Amino acid sequence: MDILIISLKSLGYSRTSRPLDSGPLVVHAVAGAGKSTALRKLLARHSTFTIHTLGVPDKISIRTRGIQKPGPIPKGNFAILDEYTLDATTREAYQALFADPYQAPELSLEPHFYLETSFRTPKKAAALIASCGFDFETNSQEEGHLEVTGIFKGPLLGKVIAIDSEAETTLSRHGVEFVKPCQVTGLEFPVVTIVSAAPIEEIGQSTLFYNAITRSKGLTYVRAGT
C-alpha cells in the first residue's frame, strides 16, 4: 500500500481525515483526472499489483497485463478495483477501490484520497459542470466548444448520448443512432452531443448529465428542452 500512497501524493491527490486502517483504501477522482493512466503505470512498474475494473477493460496486449475484468487474483498481490461504484457486490476481494463518485453517488464510500481536477475536460465544458454544482475543475489547455440549445435547435454531431427516455424515443423515431451514458463509462470522444427532453436547468445536477458531458474532450453540444 505504501507504493500506492506515494504515487497518489505525487499525482496531487488530497488526503481526507478518514483513517487508513478503516477498510480498503478508497480513492476518488473526477472524470479525466488520469486515474486509469496512473493505474496502468503502477502495473508496468510493479508486478505485485493486480488491477481489475467494472468499466471498460484494456485491450489484450503482448506487452503488458493491462487493467482487466474481475477474475483470479494472484496470491500475495495487492488487488485494486477500478469503477467500484458500478457494483456493490464485488468489493470484498480488493485492498483498494477507485472510482469517480459522481457517476454513481449512491454506491460511493467515504474516500481516503481524492482529486477534483480533470486534465481532459475542456475549459468551457468544465465551467458548465462546475456551475451545475459539482466540485470540478480542469487543467486542460483546450477551451473547447460548448453550445447549449433546445432539443430541435441544432445538429446532432459526434457521439450522441440520450439521457432520458423521451430523448431516446425521439431519436429512435428519427433513425438517429445514440447511446446511453452507462454505455460509454470510461470512454472519451472528440465530439459529443447530449440530448434531453428536459432543459439544462433540470438535468444539470443529474448523474446522467455528468456522465455524458465528461465523455467530451473537444466539442460539446447540449440539445435540451424545447
Swiss-Prot record:
Xref: InterPro entries: (+)RNA_virus_helicase_core_dom (IPR027351)
Keyword Transport on entry: yes
PROSITE patterns, alphabetized: PSRV_HELICASE
Cellular compartments per GO CC: host cell cytoplasm
GO-annotated molecular function: ATP binding; RNA binding
Subcellular location: Host cytoplasm
Domain (+)RNA virus helicase C-terminal stretches: 139-226
(+)RNA virus helicase ATP-binding domain: residues covered: 1-138
Keyword check for RNA-binding: yes
Keywords in alphabetical order: Host cytoplasm, Host-virus interaction, Inhibition of host innate immune response by virus, RNA-binding, Suppressor of RNA silencing, Transport, Viral immunoevasion, Viral movement protein
GO BP of this protein: symbiont-mediated suppression of host innate immune response; transport of virus in host, cell to cell
Pfam families linked to this entry: Viral_helicase1
Purpose: Transports viral genome to neighboring plant cells directly through plasmosdesmata, without any budding. The movement protein allows efficient cell to cell propagation, by bypassing the host cell wall barrier. Increases plasmodesma size exclusion limit. Acts as a suppressor of RNA-mediated gene silencing, also known as post-transcriptional gene silencing (PTGS), a mechanism of plant viral defense that limits the accumulation of viral RNAs.
Family named by the database record: Belongs to the Tymovirales TGBp1 protein family.
Subunit structure: Homodimer and homooligomer. Interacts with capsid protein. Interacts with host AGO1; this interaction targets the host protein for degradation, thereby suppressing the antiviral RNA silencing.
Additional notes on this entry: TGBp1, TGBp2 and TGBp3 seem to act together for cell-to-cell propagation. TGBp1 is the main movement protein that physically cross the plasmodesma with the viral genome. TGBp2 and TGBp3 would facilitate TGBp1 function.
Protein name: Movement and silencing protein TGBp1
